[in-house]
């Protein structure tokens, strides 16, 4: 007998209002044939590769930290094209259109020779080498050693019109029921998203983690990251961004291998289960009590990685990149007349060793007690950009999407939506500044807020460095050649015939 039964699952109905669809910038931005070249000055920075050198009272930074393992987050400011005195004013109609910039090409120039820089810690938490052992050795109260290594090799850059989004693992809040039982326990972890700022450290082989909070012994990692948060670009989030402003495109090259294999010192927080769960011998068989192996050694193993060979054959820098199609809906449109270029590169990681004598006289013999050794790291950048002039029509559907994306863009264009009319009656005094009436309301003029003011960037001002003469610059000539904007001059052959020489006949 067949019985009809009601459906036990949920019935999903489509939403009654239409779902908003985000359009690509190619759908409403019209590109012109006007291109500009912009190039920065040589951008130089010098500092200590491991930490800030502070004054004796700790209030002033005398030498900043400049490491090859830091991000360089450039904020490039461009002029407002709507305020340009264009040579051809027929390019656009200011009553019906607004001008914006589009990134057509980019070259990140890097100076200085290739080199490998080492990092380390004078009190590194390394009990011993675990790859080649000749005897079984337990730990003592303090087994830290002076250890150094070369970091993972990283070359990377991310280009967008908003800052690059990073991710790292951090300590998570504890549940209320477990707050009083956390002494000596491993804290819960959560993945956090933060903006990558200039000077943030990238992963050098120990992971993207908040070492400030999660490295209590201050010895598990090297000096340059022991008091820092190591971040990694959140490519998944930026690729799925509905507007695609954070990452038009990126280039990435990472390489490393495990060079040394060590074990940590200290007690193991999560003991091997055999020793705590009724000795069920699933992981090891215990040794006799008179052997050294009876007391298990530490099982917290870790490698120190190496970036290996640094070569000019695998460089992402000092070469042009052309943007034809971005990965998101924003195809290179620079909203707000600004561009964010986030760079990570430690292939030019040489640290200078500078020795200075503490004696005033001439140094005639070596004495380590009268010599001081200093470390310095230098970096050199130059940014070159090809900009394309584009037009945005002031249509209702276009302005609606731009307003939903970023209402500040319409304010910069001196546009705005008319608010709903207020039918209430307001009081308007004639002599409001006289003593006979009440004090006028203090109206504070609202200044335009910078949404990225709280972040640290390397500001690069290109508002007065644009040029239409592309052939006068290296990147401009490359752009002209690859885009076919200028054809080669034809070689006109002469129509005059050259007579052949006559041979003399031998007599």
UniProtKB/Swiss-Prot annotation:
Major location (coarse): virion
Cell location: Virion; Host nucleus
GO function term, MF aspect, one: structural molecule activity
Xref: Pfam families: Late_protein_L1
Subunit structure: Self-assembles into homopentamers. The capsid has an icosahedral symmetry and consists of 72 capsomers, with each capsomer being a pentamer of L1. Interacts with the minor capsid protein L2; this interaction is necessary for viral genome encapsidation. Interacts with protein E2; this interaction enhances E2-dependent replication and transcription activation.
Role this protein plays: Forms an icosahedral capsid with a T=7 symmetry and a 50 nm diameter. The capsid is composed of 72 pentamers linked to each other by disulfide bonds and associated with L2 proteins. Binds to heparan sulfate proteoglycans on cell surface of basal layer keratinocytes to provide initial virion attachment. This binding mediates a conformational change in the virus capsid that facilitates efficient infection. The virion enters the host cell via endocytosis. During virus trafficking, L1 protein dissociates from the viral DNA and the genomic DNA is released to the host nucleus.
Protein name: Major capsid protein L1
Source organism phylogeny: Viruses, Monodnaviria, Shotokuvirae, Cossaviricota, Papovaviricetes
Designated gene of the protein: L1
